Amino acid sequence: RAALGITQLKRINKINELRKNASLYYHKNLQNIPGIILPDMVNDKSHSYHLYTIRVTKPFKLSRNQLFKKLKNNGIRTTVYWMPIHKYSAFRKFAKVSNVVNTSKIYNEILALPLFPTISKKHQDSVIKVIKSS
C-alpha cells in the first residue's frame, strides 16, 4: 500500500488537475437549477477537489433522498458523507436540538456526486442529465 501511495504522490498534481476539471464541468453544467446549490468555486483558492458535493433544497422537485434513489436507479453511485457528530451515540448527550438545527438541515441536503480523476465527460453527462430531468 505504501508503494501505491508513493506512486500516487508522484502524480498528485495531475490527479488534482483532473479532479478540478471534472468539478468545473459539473459546475458549468449544473448552474441555475432551482434548488440545487453548488459548492463555491473560488478562483484564487486551491484544494484537492476530493468531492463535488451539491445541496438539494426545497425549490428542487425532489428531496435529496429521492434524487439519490433516482441516480442509483440510473446506475449512478452517489454518497452522503459526514453524518453530524450529534447523531453518533457517543456524542448524542452533548447536543441540544436547538443548537444543531443547521447541521441537521445541511446533512439532509448534501449529496456527493461521482468524482474521480478518470471520470469521463460521458459519465458526468449522465449524472447531469438525471439531475436536470428531475
Tell me the role of every PLM-derived stretch.
Residues R1-S134:
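PLP-dependent aminotransferase class I/II
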